[in-house]
From Swiss-Prot:
Binds to decorin which may mediate the adherence of B.burgdorferi to collagen fibers in skin and other tissues. Pfam families: Decorin_bind. This is Decorin-binding protein B. Disulfide bonds: none annotated. Gene3D superfamilies: Decorin-binding protein. Keywords: Plasmid, Signal. Belongs to the decorin-binding protein family. Residues 1-20 form the signal peptide. InterPro entries: Decorin-bd (IPR003332), Decorin-Binding (IPR053514), Decorin-db_sf (IPR038353).
Length: 187
């Protein structure tokens, strides 16, 4: 009888230790992601400040127009957008790594918290003229709630795809010269 009680006590202590380690891991992961998110938002503000120093007038942006047609400093603005996209990509990679770690043991609250951090970061991109991304991601998440690692990674991929389109529009690789993509009709 004493051995049975001893085994029960050992099992309870082992389970408590396992839960404590799991909670500690979640708290460390959450703190690391929040810190990374805050660092990224600060980098985006720094990028904006540097672009302002190069002549970009962010105040000229309208609700829908955030390009060089509504403000000065076209190349500096495009470079700022690309820098912000590159930095955001690094953050999204961290999110992916953490989601994969929690894939089997994570709960819906953890994935939703990671999604909220991604939304905060996406919203901060509006400071450099990358707008509308948050609304598109939120719209998609209404149909597919972010409660699993797979759905979180799908939302991350959606953000990356949309940022890729914005980055390509900046046309930085070609010396910053924007070209008119409208083809002329032959008569």
């Amino acid at each position: 009888m004493k051995i049975g009680k001893l085994n029960s006590i050992v099992m309870v202590l082992f389970f408590d230790l396992l839960v404590a380690c799991s909670i500690g891991l979640v708290e460390r992961t959450n703190a690391a992601l929040e810190s990374s998110s805050k660092d990224l938002k600060n980098k985006i503000l720094k990028i904006k400040k540097e672009a302002t120093g190069k002549g970009v007038l962010f105040e000229a942006f309208t609700g829908l127009k955030t390009g060089s047609k509504v403000t000065s400093g076209g190349l500096a603005l495009r470079e700022a957008k690309v820098q912000a996209i590159v930095e955001t990509g690094k953050f999204l990679k961290i999110i992916e790594e953490e989601a994969l770690k929690l894939k089997e043991t994570g709960n819906s609250g953890q994935f939703l918290a990671m999604f909220d951090l991604m939304l905060e970061v996406v919203e901060s991109l509006e400071d450099v003229g990358i707008i509308g991304l948050k609304a598109r991601v939120l719209e998609e998440s209404k149909n597919n709630p972010i409660n699993t690692a797979e759905r979180l990674l799908a939302a991350k991929a959606q953000i990356e795809n949309q940022l890729k389109v914005v980055k390509e529009k900046q046309n930085i690789e070609n010396g910053g010269e924007k070209k008119n993509n409208k083809s002329k009709k032959k008569k």
